[in-house]
Amino acid sequence: MADLGVKAGDKVLLVWSQPSSPTTLKKLAESLGAMVGTDGRVSLENMERLIMSSHAASSYDWVLSSLLSDSFSVHTSETLAEMARVIKPDGKLVLEEPVTGTDDQKVRTAEKLISALKLSGLVSVTEVSKEPLTPEAVSALKTFTGFQGNTLSRVRMSASKPNFEVGSSSQLKFSFGKKTSKPVDKPALDPNAAKAWTLSANDMDDDDVDLVDSDALLDADDFKKPDAASLKAPSCGDGTTKKKKACKNCSCGLAEELEQESKGAKTISQPKSACGSCYLGDAFRCASCPYIGMPAFKPGEKIVLANTGLNDT
């Protein structure tokens, strides 16, 4: 136990579990008592009664669990959380537990044990050592948990509690005073760099470069506005041999022209009359109405009148 680092004046909680030899447990407790001296204290607690004992929070410098070679224990998440609660800030937890090399529901791997220790609020979790279980411990473990694998070993883990209490808070100091910003010294502007950005094509003194004047690329005809007829393709809307038809993506105006002609062709001249009620029937027609005797018709319907009906007597 000398390699644990327990020193005089420390308060140690020794957690044991079944099966444990009373002689071995007493010997370990006496050895720890000699290390802590009269100023320290060594308390013994059975793991099954650890939570029910309600130890004071942050009251132990050390929690040593299942370190007896003739016993074993699987630490639950509740047990680990209780151990973390009773440890002082910066206190240590050292435990031993059987682990397996493959994932199993009854015995966890060393990686999952490390994860469980971290989830309980402990930090600096390290694997100190790993050794095979004794045949007696393997038999007892299989009887206790029902585990039937053969990849069992005993691992010792060390962890620490952070140097603050779980759930503790501290006030953050903020300065809300108006801060005067110091003037930032801008780098000096390099005249040559500025000149490089202001160069134009005319400033380049290079006889090997033949520059083209963009204004000389256009002549007077290029500035004339074209008429609609010149924009049409040679065969666009040629009605001499076939019906006029605009291109799919017509942009010369023929499509709009044909659309207007189509609308005009569909317009049907309405029957003209003085009263405007001739289409309703004889009950609404005048005595001299040319539609007398004809059935009612729809507005806009083309009606052909007999020549006799238009003769005046």
Curated annotation (Swiss-Prot):
Region annotation N-terminal SAM-like domain: where it falls in the sequence: 6-170
Localisation per UniProt entry: Cytoplasm; Nucleus; Mitochondrion intermembrane space
Record region (Linker): 171-223
Region feature Fe-S binding site B, mapped onto this chain: 275-289
Position of sequence motif Cx2C motif 2: 286-289
Ranges annotated as spanning the membrane: none
Motif (Cx2C motif 1): 275-278
Single GO BP term: iron-sulfur cluster assembly
Binding site for [2Fe-2S] cluster: 236, 247, 250, 252
Annotated spans, Fe-S binding site A: 236-252
Gene3D superfamilies noted in UniProt: Vaccinia Virus protein VP39
Binding-site residues, [4Fe-4S] cluster: 275, 278, 286, 289
One Gene Ontology cellular component annotation held by this UniProt entry: mitochondrial intermembrane space
Subunit structure and binding partners: Monomer. Interacts with ndor1. Interacts with chchd4.
Family according to the record: Belongs to the anamorsin family.
Chain's role: Component of the cytosolic iron-sulfur (Fe-S) protein assembly (CIA) machinery required for the maturation of extramitochondrial Fe-S proteins. Part of an electron transfer chain functioning in an early step of cytosolic Fe-S biogenesis, facilitating the de novo assembly of a [4Fe-4S] cluster on the scaffold complex NUBP1-NUBP2. Electrons are transferred to CIAPIN1 from NADPH via the FAD- and FMN-containing protein NDOR1.
Domain notes: The twin Cx2C motifs are involved in the recognition by the mitochondrial CHCHD4/MIA40-GFER/ERV1 disulfide relay system. The formation of 2 disulfide bonds in the Cx2C motifs through dithiol/disulfide exchange reactions effectively traps the protein in the mitochondrial intermembrane space. The C-terminal domain binds 2 Fe-S clusters but is otherwise mostly in an intrinsically disordered conformation.
Protein's name in the database: Anamorsin-A
Lineage: Eukaryota, Metazoa, Chordata, Craniata, Vertebrata
